[in-house]
Amino acid sequence: MMKACGFDIGLDHPFFLIAGPCVIESRELAFETAGRLKEITGKLGVSFIYKSSFDKANRSSGKSFRGPGMDEGLKILADVRAQLDVPVLTDVHDIDQVAPVAAVVDMLQTPAFLCRQTDFIRACAATLKPVNIKKGQFLAPHDMLQVARKARDAALEAGGDGNNILVCERGASFGYNNLVSDMRSLAIMRETDCPVVFDATHSVQLPGGQGASSGGQREFVPVLARAAVAVGVAGLFMETHPNPACAMSDGPNAVPLDRMAELLESLVALDRVTKRSGFLENQFV
C-alpha cells in the first residue's frame, strides 16, 4: 500500500483517478475541467488527481500544438492546486525539468517512450515525489520489474523508503498505428510490488493513425476501463475534454467531460465487486 496525495493507494482500497485534458490549452479550460472533475469524484467518493501536460514533446508533427511551456504551465497547475484544493500531476521529459516540476506538483509522470532511460527514471524517483511510470508500448509487462527496481533503488539512495513508485499500462504496439491491451499485464506488473494504474484512453490511441496526428477509438474506453477494473487496479488514468472534437491534442481518444460521471459510476460499482471478491490468480499457479 502507498499513501500519496492525501489518500491510500492499493488493491485494498478503491481505485483512484488521474484525469484531465491531454495538454494545458488555457487557464480557463484547466479550471473548468478540474472543477467539474472534483465535483464528480467528490460525489462518487473517488480520490482524484488532476492531470494536464505543459509540453507534449512527442507530437506526430512538428507543427502540432505542444502546450504553453513549463513556466506558464506550472503556474496554471499551481493555481489549480491552490484554488481548487486538488492534487496535480504532470509529465516531465528530461532531467532538467525534474526539479522545477517536482517543486510544484504532487505526482510526477514519465512518458512511455522514456521508461528505459535509466538516469531520467532515477532522477524522477530521487525527488521522493510519487512517480507514475508508464510502460513503453514496446515493453513486455514483466520488463517493468527492472524499471521499478531502478526507480526504487534511486529513491532509497535519496533517503526515501522506495514506496513512491507506480507503474502504468497504456497498451502495447500491435502492428502499425495500433495498440492492444493485454489484461494479463495488470496482474504481471503487480510483481513489481508497485501500485498498478491502467491508462484507459491512451490504450485506445491509434498512434500516428491520421498522418500528422494520432487517431483514437474513444468508444472502447469504457470497454477497456471496465476490463481493467474487473482484473483489479489501484488506479485509472483517463484524459477528458469538454469538446474532444476541438481538443488540441489526443481528442480522438478523450472521454467527453459530460460523460465522465456516468462512466465513473459504473466503474465504482464494478471496483467494489472486484475487490470484495479478491484476487485468485496466485491460486492457479
UniProtKB/Swiss-Prot annotation:
GO terms for cellular component: cytoplasm. The keyword Transferase applies. It is found in: Cytoplasm. It catalyses: D-arabinose 5-phosphate + phosphoenolpyruvate + H2O = 3-deoxy-alpha-D-manno-2-octulosonate-8-phosphate + phosphate. Pfam families: DAHP_synth_1. It comes from the Bacteria. Belongs to the KdsA family. This is 2-dehydro-3-deoxyphosphooctonate aldolase.
